[in-house]
Amino acid sequence: MSSTPFATFAFALIACGKLLESNALAIIRDDHSIGFYFNAHYKPTNDATNTTFGSLVSVTSESDLEYLGQVNVGGHDFNLVLDTGSSDLWVTGQQIKINSETSDNLNLTYGIGSASGNIAYTTVQLGTYQVQNQAFLNVDKTYQQGADGILGLGFISLSMIEKKIKTKAARPIMANLFEQNPTTPNFMALALERTTDNENTSGGAITIGEYVPQFKDVSGTPKYPLAPSTSSRWTIALSGMQVNGHDVTLKSVVKGAKKGTAISLIDSGTSLAYIPSNAVDAIYGAISGSIHIQSNGQNFWIVPCLGQANLSFSFGHDYLPINPLELTRLATFTDGNTQYTVCTSAFRPQLSSTGSDMDFLLGDIFMRNVYSVFNFGNSTSNNDDDKGASIQFLSRSNKDQVYQDFQQQRTQNLKNLPPLYDLSKIHSDGTSSDGGRVNS
């Protein structure tokens, strides 16, 4: 339980492994700051000297695949995926202090992977916030899940645990946290940091009920309501997409979506973005020299590593530019006995598991370009789940500057990697003239 009415918990984003390029955000603390200062380094730091708040949770970024927050569950610290795309809490692999355990078994299925176990109750601590008797899934079996667990940051109506046992403690942790701290405004704000390819760099923050000071102007930005209005997820209406200044046609398969819009899930638990095929082709077809690979169930693009497109999205007001570094992922492959570097598309055609409740799944490669505020509305009430819920964005990408800096940043990072492959040798099935194969 927080001792201050506007308590927050912050996450230091630590990059591990091969990451994307850019400068790390430095959140500078002052006497009124809820943030903390951090620099590039190779190990997480919990240095909160002279900060004005008592809650600090470290976060790591595993090869830009997922953002992990250190959360204490039942007396043990776990590195949990911060996931706005789901609502349940689960952990695995350790003996923890459990208040009580049920005989209710549950299997949670995600776009990739699953986790199963029994529902139990324990104390959960997020920074200085402590939620007593929180229901969670005590997992004993996982499939394609690399982290210690997932911290779902979505609505009650999406919680599989709450549907299973129908108790107040079974609601998602954010709903219980806001109810136990009624003076705290019920929103969370999230900044995901981009890091350089070959460095481990900290940066970024998540706060509850307050904004990081240098992003406080987000309070005056438009609030985009959930769309459709019956949505149980963090989905909003995408009203515009442009590539090099040209509009991309938007259509929706979602019932209730307005004509000319597409329903977009803003999902911190997904690394890339999964969007309609025509939108993918519009992005990479605009980059000269790109090759569309369609073979053996794969559907992606190989892109010149120094090629770029001007991509931006609008949700009803100004267009939000996407840093061109986000459009591709650096990869290596072996042709003969030699390793080479290629760049593959980061915006991918929709997964079959995306479902009919969204058209665009915008993950971390979108969220790193904005400061995102998730307003829960009345979502702490079972009687009025997500009425009034909305999302706000403040752009973090200066359009002119990011395009100007792209060549320099990408060139610098390529210096530490194997040589670029000659893309003229790659066929549309992903094979090369010399017998190698590039996979997504």
Residue spans for each PLM region:
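Cleavable N-terminal signal peptides of Sec/SRP-targeted secreted and luminal proteins
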Residues: T4-A24
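Non-catalytic N-lobe/flap surface of aspartyl protease domains
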Residues: N23-P225, A282-Q308, S352-S353
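Extended serine/threonine-enriched, polar tracts that run as long, contiguous segments within proteins
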Residues: V253-L272, A279-A282, S290-Q294, N310-S312
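Short, surface-exposed linear segments at secondary-structure transitions and domain or protein termini
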Residues: D140-I150, K216, A227-T235, T328-C343, ...
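A short acidic Gly-Thr/Ser loop motif
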Residues: G74, V81-S87, L265-S271, N278, ...
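Flexible, small-/acidic-enriched active-site or ligand-binding loops
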Residues: T201-T261, D335-N337
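Aspartic protease catalytic domain
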Residues: L20-G35, S314-S440
